[in-house]
């Protein structure tokens, strides 16, 4: 229940009444609102297997690559460019590496595999120039307890990507929230079309990596806009079901169940997030922590509810605290103490 200070008892369910209130301070049920038709370009993709040169029938804005073997086992070259070693981006897999590379508007690219690297697969992705299709977007702003966010329809999520051979590729499973993990997307900074980048990440995760959906629960762009990530059901509660349990996503391999992932768009290795992005990150962590009884400054022993594996981490951690990765970038990682303190106030 909600107390006078706005706190909620630990473990309280995040129902639409409590968690997705339209009013920034009210706990009342949001009024039903209609939808508005909005057009988005259809995401086009072209898959290739093995090393060598691949060509596409369209101008690709991103290329996703997946391989087995060493984490640094592949490289990619665009026309008139140099070879770029792919050391594995934010997305992590059990064997080998994977990377999503901005490709401008290329119609060809070349992939090179190191000795011992196998099962090289790539996917050219275009999220800006495909045939237009219409989505039903909520007419009124959607909010997570005062945090305005773009719902999946509002950023153009093609729900057919969640299906494989006519069935849901990764059926939704729900567990109690234990921790929050911060990522960066390792995509270019100064993004002129962040919604298109979110669609590219979705295609990369759902199709290239065969996860069946985008791997994060929320994403945040440089303007501070929050995007709904992993599909969690039809109850209008992002990330959670109506009982208050977190849908399992795919952002931290081996530690996903009960672990909420937030990705900041961009590369935050040598530069930090914008003030707007950091403010949205703090606000989102604060809201979720308050309503699920988490202390953003505490340390916890995470217990994977699926297999019992445990790990001691901060309640709000960086991706690198879990696995071998540079994510969320050194500069962002150095800011996590500040983010925790701000979210706890």
Enumerate the language-model features and the residues they cover:
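N-terminal "leader" segments that precede or initiate the main folded domain
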Residues: 1-11, 47-51, 60
